Amino acid sequence: KSGPTHLGKVMILRGKSDSSILWLTIWANLSFRSPVVQWYAYCVPCGAYQKKELVNMLSLYRDVLVPNRTDLNAINALLETLHRSPLGEKWGLGAIFRESNKARIVKTAPPEKIPLHALIVDLALICRETGKTRLNPFELQNDHQFSPCRIFQMTDNQLTKACVQASRLNPEFIRILKEKGSDLIELLPPATPENILNDYYNKIKI
């Protein structure tokens, strides 16, 4: 049986002191690894949903006309993750309310700014998956597969502003380039998810 990845080891070792950055990193990583999280992050817009609606939406996404236990179990696991972590309520990814013994899930834009290190981790994961080191914020907003805009419910404008700020605070990881009137985000060689997380935890200890 394989053990945790390098990123997983960093999260286990360093993640106890700040659960938000840990959970946002887990969410970003799951958006590449879990088909259900990827579907929920990229295909389910902000709004209010009953659990039954999400089950039906997932089955249609899978081209299955009648929802089955696979769909129900997947949604149950997703909602459990959102409920037991800061992701659902604090970060707007799916706050869960009980109404007449039924679960109502509300997905909104984050009520707080996404921490810059969590955002850079997600960008670093995109670079690792795609092999690209330069990313266009406008293209990221419209990307249905790899996008912090969709994972964290951000606009390309918000993403650009956050990355400009990140480039000032963490110039060793990220910089902004001007190309044909557009801003490009460039991730530098040290910007691995592991290095970014370690940098974050080193700084909060100071």
Residue ranges of predicted features:
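Donor-sugar nucleotide-binding helix/loop cap in glycosyltransferases
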Residues: 1-206
